[in-house]
From Swiss-Prot:
It comes from the Bacteria. The gene is rpsD. The keyword RNA-binding applies. This is Small ribosomal subunit protein uS4. CDD domains: S4 (cd00165). Part of the 30S ribosomal subunit. Contacts protein S5. The interaction surface between S4 and S5 is involved in control of translational fidelity. One of the primary rRNA binding proteins, it binds directly to 16S rRNA where it nucleates assembly of the body of the 30S subunit. With S5 and S12 plays an important role in translational accuracy. Residues 93-156 form the S4 RNA-binding domain. Keywords: Ribonucleoprotein, Ribosomal protein, RNA-binding, rRNA-binding. InterPro entries: Ribosomal_uS4, Ribosomal_uS4_bac-type, Ribosomal_uS4_CS, Ribosomal_uS4_N, S4_RNA-bd, S4_RNA-bd_sf. The lineage of its organism: Bacteria, Pseudomonadati, Chlamydiota, Chlamydiia, Parachlamydiales. Belongs to the universal ribosomal protein uS4 family.
């Protein structure tokens, strides 16, 4: 899968929040949206607002591609119950995201790299696929040889972040477990997200 290589700071400025949790908050230096007239926010159309909600969600989960987002939505449609909740659950239970939620990486992008480079185990077996769906009861851990990596220890010690209630964390053993399926109200998104708006947008565009 292609990795996003654009400016993450521009994205943070666009939404007015340190959306990726970067150590150097890009808003401290440039608080306005990118562009010559960044300080002036023009009123968006309904389509523009829907599009922005979708783009925010893609950003939160590590700059997912349009194809990936649509695939998750179509899977959610096939499940019984609330489509929006199923959709959010699948995004939240991606391995790279839960590695980030367990504080093994400072950012979602650092977590993606840990997975891709083979530092992560699921139930004791190496999994290097970022989109791997973690199920309740599965244990995520750092490979023993990788536990000396400085950035992992630094991320675990970051007091600014906490582990959400649907995960248990064993910092001493560099591991954590998904306790239950997360619901949208529990997901620690750094910015407000409207799932109904996103699902409505995807329903009319796929």
């Amino acid at each position: 899968m292609a990795r996003y290589t654009g400016s993450k700071n521009r994205i943070a400025r666009r939404y007015g929040v340190n959306i990726f949790g970067r150590a150097r908050n890009p808003l401290l230096h440039k608080p306005n949206p990118p562009g010559v007239h960044g300080a002036r926010r023009r009123k968006k159309s309904d389509f523009g607002l829907q599009l922005e909600e979708k783009q925010k969600l893609k950003a939160i989960y590590g700059m997912l591609s349009e194809k990936q987002l649509v695939a998750y939505y179509k899977k959610a449609l096939r499940l019984e119950g609330n489509t929006a909740s199923h959709f959010a659950e699948m995004l939240e239970c991606r391995l790279d995201n839960l590695v980030y939620r367990l504080k093994f990486g400072h950012t979602i992008f650092a977590a993606q790299q840990l997975v891709a480079h083979g530092h992560i185990l699921v139930d004791g077996k190496k999994v290097d696929r970022r989109s791997f769906q973690v199920k309740p009861g599965m244990v995520i851990s750092i490979k023993e040889k990788s536990r000396k990596i400085k950035i992992i220890a630094e991320a675990l010690d970051n007091p600014a972040r906490s582990v959400p209630e649907y995960l248990s964390s064993d910092k001493e053993h560099f591991s954590g477990q998904l306790l239950a399926k997360p619901i949208p109200e529990q997901m620690p998104w750094p910015i407000e997200i409207s799932l109904p708006v996103i699902c409505d947008f995807l329903a009319h565009s796929t």
